[in-house]
Amino acid sequence: MPAGARYDAAMTDLSAFWRINPSDADPAETREWLDAFDALVQAEGRERATFLLRKLLDHARARRVPLPPVLNTPYKNSIALADQAPFPGNLELEQRISSIVRWNALAMVVRANRAYPELGGHIASYASAADLFEVGFNHFFRSDDLVYFQPHSAPGVYARAFLEGRLSEEQLSNYRRETEGKGLCSYCHPYLMPEFWQFPTGSMGLGPLSAIYQARFMRYLEHRGIQKTAGRKLWAFVGDGEMDEPESLAGLSLAARDGLDNLIFVVNCNLQRLDGPVRGNGSIVQELEGLFAGAGWNVIKLLWGSDWDPLFARDEDGVLLKRLHETVDGEFQTYAATDGRFNREHFFNKYPELRQIIAHMSDADIDRLHRGGHDPVKIYAAYRAAVEHAGQPTVILAKTKKGYGMGLWGQGKMGTHQQKKLDDAALKEFRDRFALPLSDEDVVQLRFFHPGADSQEIRYLEARRKELGGYLPARIVSSSRLAVPSLQVPPRNQSTTMVFVQLLAQLMKDEKLGARVVPIVADEARTFGMQTLFRQFGIYSALGQLYEPEDHEELLYYREAKDGQILEEGITEAGALSSWLAAATSYSSHGTPMLPFYIYYSIFGFQRVGDLIWAAADSRARGFLVGGTAGRTTLAGEGLQHQDGSSHLAASAVPNCRAYDPCFGYELAAIVHDGARRMLEGQEDVFYYVTVGNENYPHPAMPEDAAEGILRGLYRLRDGSQVQLLGSGAILREVIAAAELLEKDWGIQAAVWSVTSFTELRRDGMRAERARRFGAEGEAWVQRCLHGTQGPVVAASDYVSAVADLIRPYVPGKYVALGTDGFGRSDTRAALRAFFEVDARNIAVAALAALQSPLLPEALRRYGIDPGTRPPWER
């Protein structure tokens, strides 16, 4: 709809509304002003009218006149009837298809819960969204578009795929029964259905945020010349209650700044969340309109069906619009749950003028009045306006009824979200409501209905999808493989962070792979020494660089570019992780494998955005998460909030995340190379979490025969016959120093082992243990490495002791795990390591204690360790 037409419609509606507004002290004068303004528009045009309005606003501000908010429009459809795009489809056939899908979705959930009440499931959400989906499937969702589906509506998507022949009746019968490989997962899970679902949206709020950054990544691919994405759309179906999640709104301004007109949000405004109304005492539609419009989005209200058009046409005094404005959502929910007689009495009969507007209508006529989200004609018009709008992202606020069509058993009811069972009477009423050709026995037995491959419905459905390019959702994995170059790190005194930046630069400079590398930071590039990449590779900006940067005369100046390679996201870990997720799934979303590296303060990863990382695992993401300034004692002065001691424990719980904590540059190089090779050449559905620190120290050359152990998680650095010392990350150097203390001060020979991954060692041990449990042979890598060694084993890391404890079941003999349990502190590294009892002296004392050495008391005195102090986790 043209902006001018929307403006005219809005002004006409507001004019009528203000004429009867009781707060208007002089309606006649108001009418004169409005008539004068109409005459101005008629005589001199909209541009002149806009100019004068701006002048008036400026003048009002100068005179300190309070101004009302101007972000809201009247509570009716944004698209006037005269501007409505004609519906091109066969409405009768599409409604029959929709009714069949509705039945099969309902039958799927109810059947599952009759057999196994603990399975759960949802009926009401899809009941409210069915027409929104169907118009998209029949007319708008192209096969190369991306669609983020509202997760609770998954049964409806399954039911449609059943009609399309892509899912079997057996699969529908096994809804939420997956372990035997014949069922369907609860929500949208690519990990569980890797050929079907593309995007996991089950955790509320992550879908909207991920969708925005995915749409932006599509532009990134286009602007960098990697892939043509122009013409493709991204649709995100979200719930109005879901918009209360902070993540749902977090990316709105980014989408507007970048002009993402490839992005369309459809907010299913059924006015209900799980327990009750979303805004019982207000209006979620008006609230969301203000938020989206204020952020710079194009807003389309889809509130009322075609049967409301004659009522608005009869509303000469604006009384209908007034009544709609004053009705809060709690009342609208009640109207949804009740019949036409109730609606006449409590809504329409409030004003005599309004009563007259519907005087010709029966109670049944009133009961049949549709909300906009249930009218395919109005939905089509809104979608058409959205796809044709340029320069802005669009949000469609579609008003619906939760549990639509479920009658007294569910429509608009407070508990409808939890409704999983319907009795026979309710099922028969549902059948009759949607004119389904089912016998009473079919209904009672909850039989799925398919009209037949040669039926009009199926032929029509197939023709529509053929015209749009194919079926959705469908996850298609690229088969292209990218070669990974060798990586070299010269021995020198530096931090593992600087080693990482060198490795990243080598990959980015590679002739074949370089363009596919996506460096991502959340406003900490300088902290990690990545400013060296600014000038050469550029920072991505959809606008390029419209200013001359302050440091433009410097060699490494801050360079933004439309084809920039670095994604500098600002202070938003959730946004940066969403960009990483888009890049890490590009191989399946766009058929273009990419290699993203997101580096961040390690404490602000799994602890801050762990839910997004879990979604990445579900998405089968491929890429590197790099936890910088890692370790509770290695990041010295920052203190309690910033010092990470737990991320590796969290990472160990993510099945397809391979987590490493290297100490030396050659370890990091081996891990990055092997990870890139596995993901790009081997096409393994894994991602890597690697921690790097900011402590400078010498990095030796790689020992012979260390490669396998580095990747498997454990290898020996130094021989010793009396005690085995294991260390990971920065604390490995304390372990080496402890071995030297033991030899120098106490004459004890200690072997030193580098643990690059306690997580990989644990998983290897679990596999071996499981094999033995089932009667096969199995030996853990830890057991293989330590076989034949002497003495107890002492392990230390810069993380909580539970990390080192991960391998306890597989360590032969006595095992002591040291870690940084407790809250962090601001101090020097030496002081912090002494405080957390992971410095060389404490490790040496732990070894003596494990050996039950009589030298222990003397060692405590010599090293100044007071055994009477409270443990660090209690201080």
Language model regions located:
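N-terminal amphipathic, basic-rich helices that act as targeting or association modules
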Residues: 12-168, 494-510, 521
